[in-house]
Regions:
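ATP-binding N-lobe of GHMP and related small-molecule kinases
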Residues: 2-130, 148, 152, 157, ...
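Generic non-transmembrane alpha-helical segments
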Residues: 104-111, 158, 162-165, 258, ...
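Conserved, helical-rich catalytic subdomain that frames metal- and/or nucleotide-binding sites
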Residues: 175, 180-276
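Contiguous, small/hydrophobic- and glycine-enriched helical/loop subdomains that border
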Residues: 117, 139, 143-180, 184-187
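Oxyanion/phosphate-interacting regions
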Residues: 1-4, 18, 269-276
Length: 276
């Protein structure tokens, strides 16, 4: 999937690409944006720095599990607030200020001096707490949708900078497709691929908290201070060739041991998948 597109609705509303500027005051009454979840084909994690963040190198690939955010203009009495409603209620998804989509709308308003608020409608399709960055996709979609609705006209590089302030995984959905993430994962560089890939995801009833997995990773590595590895040439070659089997042989994730330590029963799932 390529970078996100905003689809406004209204009598004179044009289609708006997230990488191009739009008029200061859009005429659309609502804007819909779809954003993909992701899978990490490779993840190398280093020791945390003084700020507590882990340096890493990863390869993201967008998947066709799609989050949809619709940004709607508010009535006069609600003017200036940011609200979020789920299309399908889910107790695991907050709708208050802790939701990344709400934070994204507020951050964009603050950065651009917009005084009006927005009503966000969210349709979720990415599993919660599955490591597939559904919340980050929501935030990216909210940035693009509000940028179009409010006519703030920020280009993609400026949206990406705001996205990085929200979380390391938020910039990637703005470009989608397949990309290398470096730094904290927020520095995104697209890479060439060929063909399409069909992923099978085994979903557990209870997800794993990303912070909890990183904490266990730190406990397991101890004073070893692992160095961040580069993306293997075998993996990028497989992507360039569209070779699914070679790509499968190159998949690697430094957090797998920590996840298995927290949830040992996942080892059986992995064994079944590898034998299939």
């Amino acid at each position: 999937m390529s970078h996100l597109r905003a689809v406004p609705s209204g009598p004179t509303a044009p289609s708006c690409d997230s990488s191009s500027a739009s008029p200061r005051s859009g005429s659309a009454s609502s804007v819909r944006v779809e954003a993909p979840g992701k899978v990490n084909l490779f993840l190398s994690v280093g020791a945390p720095g003084p700020d507590g963040y882990h340096p890493l190198t990863t390869v993201f690939q967008a998947v066709r599990l799609i989050e949809t955010v619709t940004a709607r203009r508010q009535s006069a009495q609600d003017h200036g607030t940011v609200t979020l409603t789920l299309e399908e209620p889910d107790a695991d998804v907050p709708t208050d200020a802790s939701n990344l989509a709400v934070q994204a709308a507020k951050l964009l308003a603050e950065a651009t001096g917009v005084g009006e608020g927005v009503d966000l409608l969210l349709r979720k399709r990415v599993p919660v707490a599955g490591g597939m960055a559904g919340g980050s996709a929501d935030a990216a979609a909210a940035l693009v949708a509000c940028n179009a609705l409010w006519g703030t006209g920020l280009p993609l590089p400026e949206l990406s900078a705001l996205a990085a302030r929200l979380g390391a995984d938020v910039p990637f959905p703005l470009t989608g497709a397949t990309a290398v993430g470096s730094g904290r994962g927020d520095l995104v560089t697209p890479i060439m691929t060929r063909g399409s890939y069909h992923w099978v995801f085994a979903l557990a009833e209870d997800g794993l908290s990303t912070p909890a997995v990183f904490r266990r990773f730190d406990e397991l590595t101890g004073a070893g201070e692992p160095a961040v590895r580069d993306v293997p040439e075998a993996l990028t070659a497989a992507l360039r060739a569209g070779d699914a089997r070679a790509l499968a042989d190159s998949l690697d994730n430094d957090l797998q041991a920590a996840a298995l330590d927290l949830r040992p029963e996942l080892a059986e799932v992995i064994a079944v998948a590898e034998e299939a």
